Amino acid sequence: MGKVYDWFEERLEIQAIADDITSKYVPPHVNIFYCLGGITLTCFLVQVATGFAMTFYYRPTVTEAFASVQYIMTEVNFGWLIRSVHRWSASMMVLMMILHVFRVYLTGGFKKPRELTWVTGVILAVLTVSFGVTGYSSPWDQIGYWAVKIVTGVPEAIPVVGSPLVELSRGSVSVGQSTLTRFYSLHTFVSPLLTAVFMLMHFLMIRKQGISGPL
């Protein structure tokens, strides 16, 4: 094992990377509330893992979506647990995100030179909410259907561009298969990818600038 480690160490300088990570200065005022962002990240990773597991059985069609969710809950080994953890971690992620935003705002973590960190955080907050909106439609039950109909109908109040926006979000004039396909794509691919990118930017900036000092 020593020779294998030395081979990687010679090429990647693993020890230097480890020393940089473990020796980062942590201000003495930091408390448990500064962990809220990390907890949000943990919830996101749980979401990715459980969501990926359910994609093996879920069918994003208006005729099979509800039945496939029922199949996951009743027939798949530990399917009920996987879906329940997915739902619980989704609620926890939203809660932790809100608390994290309040903590950063109240402690002045958005001030110079951390404005861009705050901007990426706000974008991540919007993406977090988008997970809830797009994922709510997945079972395609009565609640999911009418929630999608209401949400996609909101832009109709906007003059001139309202109706085109509604049709764009629904994929047609009315809510149907195109709507479910769009929401499923956003929920399982677009939103997770954007979230991963902005999280990486967010953490790199925190790593570079460090934790903000006390007020």
Curated annotation (Swiss-Prot):
SUPFAM superfamilies from the UniProt entry: Transmembrane di-heme cytochromes
Annotated GO MF terms: electron transporter, transferring electrons within cytochrome b6/f complex of photosystem II activity; metal ion binding; oxidoreductase activity
Localisation per UniProt entry: Plastid, Chloroplast thylakoid membrane
Source species, domain of life: Eukaryota
Cofactor note: Binds 2 heme b groups non-covalently with two histidine residues as axial ligands.
Residues that, per the record, bind heme b 1: H100, H202
Residues binding heme c: C35
Membrane topology: Multi-pass membrane protein
Cofactor: heme b; heme c
Protein residues bound to heme b 2: H86, H187
Presence of the UniProt keyword Nucleotidyltransferase in the record: no
Keywords in alphabetical order: Chloroplast, Electron transport, Heme, Iron, Membrane, Metal-binding, Photosynthesis, Plastid, Thylakoid, Transmembrane, Transmembrane helix, Transport
TM ranges: 32-52, 90-110, 116-136, 186-206
Any GO BP: respiratory electron transport chain
Note in the entry: Heme 1 (or BH or b566) is high-potential and absorbs at about 566 nm, and heme 2 (or BL or b562) is low-potential and absorbs at about 562 nm.
Subunit (UniProt): The 4 large subunits of the cytochrome b6-f complex are cytochrome b6, subunit IV (17 kDa polypeptide, PetD), cytochrome f and the Rieske protein, while the 4 small subunits are PetG, PetL, PetM and PetN. The complex functions as a dimer.
Protein's UniProt name: Cytochrome b6
Gene responsible for this protein: petB
